Amino acid sequence: MDAVVNLTTLPYRRSVGILVFNHEGKVWVGRRLMVCIHEDTKIYHRWQLPQGGIDENEEPLDAARRELYEETGIRSIELIKEAKYWFHYDFPQEIVGSVLGSKYRGQIQKWFAFQFTGELSEIKINPPPDGHKAEFDQWKWVDLETLPSIVISFKKHVYMKIVNEFRGSFKGL
């Protein structure tokens, strides 16, 4: 039987989240590969924005650019806006033992919005560039407002904040 982890004693993992707007003002989302959380529980194909951890001594903006490239191959971007605040979410108790080795209670994220200035052929998710592990099996452009309705439930409140933070940020080319 697995030991129960006391979430309140664990720190949040510092990470970044990335919105990429296309020339029509739609946002890039990727469909996560199936994640096996526990032998009895599987999370199938949820959509999410690119995100990832901030390395030691790395600035959040640099981490955002790195994570975006590692997960999507996208490099042709221009910064539109950095979120004013950090947003956080907690992992559900039942997945803490499987996510990030039980070291974190959740993630605290700095979010960035970018304008995609490249060609669609630049986007490579499976496999992503430079031997990085694939995280997505499909991608599409969606309206910013739809994001909270397509993500896993424990991230929904953060995505609602992201929509509020970045609504009106897209200026077009």
Swiss-Prot record:
PROSITE patterns given for it? NUDIX, NUDIX_BOX
One Pfam family hit: NUDIX
Q: Which GO terms describe its biological process?
A: nucleoside phosphate metabolic process; ribose phosphate metabolic process
CDD domains (UniProt xref):
NUDIX_Ap4A_hydrolase_plant_like
One example GO MF annotation: bis(5'-adenosyl)-pentaphosphatase activity
Task: Write down the EC number.
Answer: 3.6.1.-
Tell me the keywords, alphabetical order: Hydrolase
* Highest taxon of source: Bacteria
Please report the stretch or stretches of sequence annotated as the Nudix hydrolase domain.
11-164
Cofactor(s) named in the record: a divalent metal cation
Q: What class of enzyme is it?
A: hydrolase
Keyword Magnesium in the entry? The reply is no
Q: Does the keyword Transferase apply?
A: no
Where can the motif Nudix box be found?
52-73
HAMAP family per UniProt = Nudix_RppH
Function, in words: Accelerates the degradation of transcripts by removing pyrophosphate from the 5'-end of triphosphorylated RNA, leading to a more labile monophosphorylated state that can stimulate subsequent ribonuclease cleavage.
Family as reported in the entry's similarity comment: Belongs to the Nudix hydrolase family. RppH subfamily.
The protein's name is RNA pyrophosphohydrolase
| Gene name linked to the record | rppH
